[in-house]
């Protein structure tokens, strides 16, 4: 009987991907059906519209998709939406770059129109990329955060929190990005190592005693409101309650003690300005100090209240940049012999995450969500959530423990969700909030009912992007038509580790305030994809790889395989070697399936009742254990571990050993019908199961093989994950199989050492062992795979370390 394969010689991934994407879309394979009781809801990270996605983004989005596909195959009704975060500063920066405009220089409406245009273009590009990768989103659940539906949800959240007393507006110190001219939250501040100078400056007390101050911010001397020393520092205890004179500016400031001063840092005497850093804010609040703000929102010195004459130093400093002011102050101090020492240093400087520029702390009216007063409650919420890996929970706990500022949610930008607020000019009225039924509203374009434009002032700020993104678990309500903010804890939040302090934390906060609930039961945290030099991939650094180029070269399955080879929570260096391994796996899977396809017509639906032979039972037992391990790993979101078990079985047990030993029985050469049926049913069952377990990782090739061999719907259908069936497991047959493989490996080694082909015929295969009998089918398979004419068993002597000692006599 001539057997023919159902497969072409080479797998053509481009043709397959195009065909299957159209097929999956046509049959709505990933559609959420809203079935009660079998829900698995994923809180998907909406990619920011800030430029093209690079391979690092692909890396983490694939991780979520592995879980979505697995849960769907378990029989769950998976709600897997996709959103795009297209409001806020990142999108504004992109638009300014592409359109070569500045938001501040054109009409607000015109700029917002440009933002909408650019956002729509990039959303379509992202969609095409995600579909090319086989990400199994339900595109009917698509949203974007500047849409009217999301604006309404975000404004509803604001009003609800305002009515609860959890949101307030206040004039207080805030972090200010002078480059983007907006307030930012603490989480948007990062530290950068920069070179600077530590300058030691001569101050004097009011009584004339000389005292020295070391500072990196001499330009803030006009804003100095106190000097501090540690109460245990005997050098300065006599100064308590005295006043100091700030050199060249002449302002008189109190000298006070505080435990926060480090005795061994600088001179031990510290200048407190409004405001140089967070410690200044702490002292200003604690000691009820005066306020002297000298930095403008544009990052220049504002000394108009200090200027007595235009030719004074204050006059020269007014309106110049911070860097230039620092230089002028130091030059003046030096001329006056008040600059004692100027030492070049490297130190950490707090910078705005987006612009990269050093931040300032200014006094400004802003909106805040209360955080500090509920730190304990938030820690309790954090501990109710399952964190994968568990170590990531410590990050957010440390962040919450260290919080001492409420969350500033207002931004002085343009393309964002407006605050639904007007400020009344009527007597005894302050803030006007619209009715929820009027939302969404833009107060700059709408008047509150019963008011004229002369009676109100619109709030022109927009909300922090995170104030909206942190409501992502509730976004599904825009598809269910619920006119509220429902929150059933999602099954899973998947995200990367760098936004634990922002997206994860803020979402936990919102869920606690709105529903006294956790937002999700589980959180799965991915690491970063790093460039070859182990730095984070970034478009601005020029080290980011473009996914489309790699998809054209390797195909989606290989890219997904690469993404799966990363431990949860761990950073992974991009590797061409892993891509080559993925390519090799695709080729081997195709070729192995091509071989099995010759026999599948006999057993389209494998019947394990036909499995009678020892080595068939061995491979089924090994397969059973892989199903158990892969299922256990997927259940705790360890996709990498699951893939490792599956791939190890495929290469080692299935391809290297089982396919070789079973060929003779599969072809039906000189074997009984029973032996042949046992082989082909086992082959079909093992391949089908392997395809199903690989399907979450490599959806295209597994679907192509499955649909070619088995006329049984899509491999990605519900309830298609292999069942853990204990009847597959036979410990005795497994041990016989392991003995078989040990003997086979010894024979292969003998032939290799003799530089003979593995097909070289053996006349006599001699197995030395104690009290060991082998089943007939076992011996027949061993003869076939070793190409041995006879097997001879001898009693082994006790001094051998190995269980078996194998020798051969080759045919002459």
From Swiss-Prot:
It comes from Ehrlichia ruminantium (strain Gardel). One of its GO terms (molecular function) is aminoacyl-tRNA deacylase activity. InterPro entries: aa-tRNA-synth_I_CS (IPR001412), aa-tRNA-synth_Ia (IPR002300), Anticodon_Ia_Val (IPR033705), M/V/L/I-tRNA-synth_anticd-bd (IPR013155), Rossmann-like_a/b/a_fold (IPR014729), tRNAsynth_Ia_anticodon-bd (IPR009080), Val/Leu/Ile-tRNA-synth_edit (IPR009008), Valine-tRNA_ligase_type_2 (IPR022874). This is Valine--tRNA ligase. The gene is valS. Catalyzes the attachment of valine to tRNA(Val). As ValRS can inadvertently accommodate and process structurally similar amino acids such as threonine, to avoid such errors, it has a 'posttransfer' editing activity that hydrolyzes mischarged Thr-tRNA(Val) in a tRNA-dependent manner. Its main location: cytoplasm. SUPFAM superfamilies: Anticodon-binding domain of a subclass of class I aminoacyl-tRNA synthetases, Nucleotidylyl transferase, ValRS/IleRS/LeuRS editing domain. A motif ('HIGH' region) lies at residues 47-57. It comes from the Bacteria. Belongs to the class-I aminoacyl-tRNA synthetase family. ValS type 2 subfamily.
């Amino acid at each position: 009987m001539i057997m023919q394969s159902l497969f072409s010689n080479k797998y053509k991934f481009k043709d397959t991907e195009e065909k299957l994407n159209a097929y999956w879309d046509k049959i709505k394979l990933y559609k959420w059906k809203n079935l009660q009781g079998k829900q698995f809801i994923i809180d998907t990270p909406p990619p920011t519209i800030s430029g093209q996605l690079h391979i690092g983004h692909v890396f983490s989005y694939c991780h979520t998709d592995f879980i979505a596909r697995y849960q769907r195959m378990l029989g769950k009704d998976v709600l897997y939406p996709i959103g795009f975060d297209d409001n806020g500063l990142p999108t504004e920066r992109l638009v300014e770059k592409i359109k070569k405009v500045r938001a501040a220089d054109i009409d607000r409406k015109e700029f917002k129109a440009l933002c909408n245009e650019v956002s729509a273009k990039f959303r379509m590009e992202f969609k095409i990329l995600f579909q090319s990768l086989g990400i199994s989103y339900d595109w009917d659940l698509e949203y974007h955060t500047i849409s009217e539906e999301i604006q309404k949800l975000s404004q509803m959240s604001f009003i609800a929190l305002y009515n609860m007393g959890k949101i307030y507006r206040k004039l207080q110190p805030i972090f200010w990005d002078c480059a983007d001219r907006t307030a930012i939250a603490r989480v948007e501040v990062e530290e950068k190592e920069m070179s600077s100078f530590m300058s030691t400056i001569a101050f004097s007390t009011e009584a004339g005693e000389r005292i020295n101050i070391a500072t990196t911010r001499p330009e803030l001397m006009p804003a100095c409101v106190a000097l501090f020393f540690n109460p245990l520092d005997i050098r300065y205890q006599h100064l308590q309650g005295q006043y100091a004179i700030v050199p060249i500016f002449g302002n008189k400031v109190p000298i006070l003690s505080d435990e926060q001063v480090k005795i061994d840092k600088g001179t031990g005497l510290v200048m407190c300005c409004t405001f140089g850093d967070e410690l200044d804010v702490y002292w200003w609040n604690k000691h009820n100090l005066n306020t002297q703000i000298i930095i403008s929102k544009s990052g220049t010195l504002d000394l108009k209240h200090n200027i007595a004459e235009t030719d004074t130093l204050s006059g020269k400093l007014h309106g110049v940049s911070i860097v230039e002011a620092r230089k002028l102050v130091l030059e003046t101090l030096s001329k006056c012999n008040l600059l004692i020492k100027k030492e070049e240093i490297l130190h950490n400087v707090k910078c705005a995450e987006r612009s990269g520029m050093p931040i300032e702390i200014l006094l400004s009216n802003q909106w805040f969500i209360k955080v500090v007063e509920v730190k304990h409650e938030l820690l309790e919420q954090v501990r109710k959530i399952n964190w994968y890996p568990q170590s990531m929970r410590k990050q957010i706990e440390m962040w919450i423990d260290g919080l001492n500022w409420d969350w500033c949610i207002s931004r002085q930008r343009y393309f964002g969700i407006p605050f639904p607020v007007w400020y009344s000019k009527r007597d005894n009225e302050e803030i006007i909030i619209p009715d929820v039924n009027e939302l969404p509203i833009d107060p700059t374009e709408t008047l509150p009912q019963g008011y004229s434009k002369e009676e109100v002032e619109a709030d022109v700020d927009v909300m922090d992007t995170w104030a909206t993104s942190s409501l992502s678990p509730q976004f599904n309500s825009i598809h269910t038509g619920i006119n509220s903010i429902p929150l059933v804890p999602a099954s899973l939040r998947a995200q990367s580790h760098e936004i634990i302090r922002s997206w994860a934390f803020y979402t936990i906060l919102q869920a606690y305030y709105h529903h006294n609930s956790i937002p999700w039961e589980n959180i799965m945290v991915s690491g970063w994809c790093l460039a070859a030099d182990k730095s984070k991939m970034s478009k601005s650094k020029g080290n980011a790889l473009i996914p489309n180029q790699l998809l054209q070269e390797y195909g989606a399955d290989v890219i997904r395989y690469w993404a799966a080879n990363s431990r949860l929570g761990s950073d992974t260096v991009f590797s061409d070697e892993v891509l080559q391994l993925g390519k090799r796996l695709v080729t081997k899977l195709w070729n192995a399936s091509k071989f099995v396809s010759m026999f599948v017509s006999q057993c389209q639906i494998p019947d394990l009742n036909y499995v009678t032979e020892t080595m068939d039972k061995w491979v089924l037992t090994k397969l059973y254990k892989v199903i158990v391990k892969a299922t256990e790993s997927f259940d705790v979101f360890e996709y990498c571990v699951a893939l490792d078990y599956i791939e190890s079985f495929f290469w080692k047990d299935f391809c290297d050993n089982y396919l070789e030993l079973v060929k003779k029985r599969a072809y039906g050469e000189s074997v009984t019908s029973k032996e042949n049926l046992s082989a082909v049913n086992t082959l079909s069952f093992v391949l089908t199961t392997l395809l199903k377990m690989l399907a979450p990782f490599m959806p295209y090739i597994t679907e192509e093989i499955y649909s070619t061999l088995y006329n049984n719907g899509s491999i990605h259908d519900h309830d298609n994950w292999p069942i853990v069936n204990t009847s597959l497991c036979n410990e005795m047959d497994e041990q016989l199989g392991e003995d078989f493989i040990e003997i086979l490996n010894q024979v292969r080694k003998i032939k290799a050492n003799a530089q003979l082909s593995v097909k070289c015929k053996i006349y006599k295969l001699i197995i030395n062992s104690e009290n060991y009998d082998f089943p007939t089918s076992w011996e027949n398979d061993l003869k076939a795979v070793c190409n041995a004419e006879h097997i001879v068993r001898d009693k082994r002597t006790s001094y051998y370390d190995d269980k078996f000692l194998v020798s051969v006599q080759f045919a002459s």
